[in-house]
Amino acid sequence: MKRRGWLCALVALCPLSCEHLGPRTIVADRVAYDDAVATSWKEQALLNIVKLRYFDTPFFVDVAQIVSGYTLGEQVTPALGFNQAFFPGATFGQRLVGNLALQETYLDRPTVSYAPQTRPDFIRNLAIPLPPSAVLYMMQAGYPVDVVFDLTLDAINGVQGRSVSGAEVRPASAEYRRVVEILRKAQLSGSVGMRIEVGKDKKESLVMFFREPDIDPELAAELVEARNLLHIDPARREFKVVFGAARGSGEEVTMATRSLFRVLTLLATSVQVPDDHLAEGRAPPLGGDPGTDRPRFTVFSGCQKPKDCFTATCYRGRWFWVDDRDAESKRTMAFLMVLLALADTGTKEPVPFLTIQTN
């Protein structure tokens, strides 16, 4: 009976050593790392927005590589002893006692490598204006035209939008707000679109067009109003789109786009700086007249980290956050993440070689 008990215990341990650990970790780990990287990405973007409000230098660090390794170890220690304090007349075998100790070890050893975003192409993409094609691609992809234009355009065909220079804010003109309002209606109805045309010289040109047949007569009249406000031919339905700050011809639309750095600077004006920081001169007060522009992005500040926040970061001893109930700010933040991803293009710097222990 003793021998049978020992054999049963050893057989019971065998499945532990044969069980596959790796496949069961993929789902849990992938989701966990995805959430962690996305959370840190948002916090980094918010931190750089807050830094710009304080005239500090933004900086980006990329998660270059994640390698996760697991080690499962088992150790079985048998012990045999002789118990003298036993009932009188016990045989030698009855006085023998034994035990079996099982020790399992589970080690998770993730290796994360980081890379500062100092590549020339990344810095250049932050500094140069976005191409008009990127703006219209975002609109074509379904991003609201009012969000896209308000964040990425200084002017459209000479009609001035909201602009920021340092801490001075210039509101968008009434004509600009009306044009964006009409284009948003056209976007929702599917009456506006864009395409790429290739000319005889093999050069590509960007064309924005309006689908006016069979649309609501009221919307058709508003689209004519928008073309008049933009000083383009109201009878035309297709227009070439080019980069420029000045008004183009009646057959083309110019777009004065912003760089990603200016997009971040614009969002920085929505940071609520603590009063004592303003009084101490740590951040400048906003100048100019914001007009009637409703902010699409709001960053709150306080001494304690809130429990219900979309993303938060700590800077200079204060917490700054985007409220999780502020859908407009969350949508703006999500669009900013796409713009930052567009800037992170080009040749990647080689990641470091990692030596991974396999036993």
Predicted feature locations:
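N-terminal amphipathic/basic membrane-interacting segments and domains
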Residues: 19-359
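N-terminal export leaders
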Residues: 3-7
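C-terminal motif of bacterial Sec signal peptides marking the signal peptidase cleavage site
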Residues: 14-17
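Hydrophobic helical h-region of N-terminal Sec-dependent signal peptides
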Residues: 9-12
